[in-house]
Amino acid sequence: MMTVYLPVNEALLTDYLKYLFPTEKGSSCLKVSGACSFGKLLIANITTSGHPVSVPEGDNVIKLHIPKQDCTQDLADKFLYFTKGSVCRLNAALKAVFDMDFHDYYQRGIDKGYQKKDIIDAFIISRKLCSVDPGDALHKRTYRHEQKKRLSRARYLARKANYIQESLDISGLNTIPQ
């Protein structure tokens, strides 16, 4: 196994990364899998060096084990790291994967008739997002998303009403036949 470190922007996303790639037995390293799309993205963004690289510092630095496969065999016996640009892109992609997963889970729960709070709690537990308190953040995210949908719908209805009003302009028909 080859090792690389990834600084993650948020503790919530650190927990989500642990959900995507479970730790190996007896180790704190996450085992990256190429079966997951984000795993493929991680592997594709690895940079190699012929000399040792410094380990990133911070609270949310994750140690990843990269499996030896056909596509990673040229990484063996080299020092692996992520560039600052790739760390930024990977964090943005991880957030997008999280958002899509949450939105999909939430929508399926709503479609089945479950309450919003129950869906969010089930998502937190199923994804093992318990080392931080993501409840408020997810409730706020859901609220903002619903607010955007309501505003979009209100704008659509206002445009539709305006169109109908203009098409039915009756200003020239003020006389009533007797």
PLM features: what roles do these ranges have?
Residues K149-E166:
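Short Lys/Arg-enriched helix C-cap and helix-to-coil transition segments
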Residues Q107-R127:
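Short, charged amphipathic recognition helices of the HTH superfamily
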Residues I124-A137, N162-Y163:
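Short, basic interhelical loop/turn and adjoining N-cap
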Residues N91-K112:
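Positively charged, polyanion-binding regions of nucleic-acid-associated proteins
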Residues S131-R150:
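Major-groove recognition helix of helix-turn-helix-like DNA-binding domains
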